[in-house]
Amino acid sequence: MPENVSLIRNRTEVGQGRAWGSGAGARPAWVVMVLAGVLIFTSVVDVLGNVLVIISVLRNRKLRNAGNAFVVSLAFADLLVVCYPYPLVLHAMLHAGWLPGEMECKVSGFLMGASVIGSIFNITAIAINRYCFICQANTYEKIYGRAGTLVLLTLVWVLTAIAILPNLSLGSLTYDPRVYSCTFSQTTSAGYTIAVVTVHFLLPIAVVTFCYLRIWVLVLRVRRRVTTDVRPRLRPSELRHFLTMFVVFVLFAVCWAPLNLIGLAVAVDPPRVGPLVPDWLFVMSYF
């Protein structure tokens, strides 16, 4: 009997979700198919790319270093969202609503948040690692030994867990029919939303920007032969690795900046600003 009551409650919540705004039920079939296609393509690329990265590092002894440890951690963070949340999002798209229960919704939202915040924290850790390797060569080995790297990796995921756990107590992980997924609600708590955007996006972006700017300055100085102190640290392979991670950072920042800026704007005045955000803009920033 309790299971039947729970099922009825879940179905009712789905029905209410469809009626909210211009929810999933009001969306043309071709739009749903396009979004589903984008999600499937993204999932396949995520799995293939990140699994190849992990296998390459594990199989090649030369790639097993402190810098690549954070790259593997980043790949793992990306895979979190593919293993559970994305299949449920695809299921919600094809069924015009969320059919699984509330627990599945919470788990999906938790893993999606862990993936996003874990990614930004790992990208930050990679930038700091590259900065220390290239600009602070004398202290690099002291910080990034085997034990130090393990401690820093653990710290990245502990901070990620600390960042996500408040969502469970605040009840801010809810189903959003605009994006067919259980995600962080930007209107649950204005103060918490501002804190999330500031601490988990703007601050890491500032740290990464500082690190890469310092590296760029040093690279330009070396190329212009202003200094030769760090030339051994700027081998072509290391420069390519730096450029690759810099591109990853730029793409991540560009992709996630719109959603975070929308959240910041909504948090300032949820009742007034929230309804002004067009569904298409929110969906585009999310996907």
Curated annotation (Swiss-Prot):
Q: Name one GO molecular function term.
A: G protein-coupled receptor activity
Which cellular component, as a GO term, is one annotated location?
plasma membrane
Q: How does it sit in the membrane?
A: Multi-pass membrane protein
Any one of the GO BP annotations: rhythmic process
Q: Does the keyword Transmembrane apply?
A: yes
Cystine bridges: 105-182
Name the InterPro entries on file.
GPCR_Rhodpsn (IPR000276), GPCR_Rhodpsn_7TM (IPR017452), Mel_1A/1B_rcpt (IPR002278), Melatonin_rcpt (IPR000025)
Localization per record: Cell membrane
The alphabetical list of record keywords is: Biological rhythms, Cell membrane, Disulfide bond, G-protein coupled receptor, Glycoprotein, Membrane, Receptor, Transducer, Transmembrane, Transmembrane helix
Q: What is this protein called?
A: Melatonin receptor type 1B-A
What organism is recorded for this protein? Danio rerio (Zebrafish)
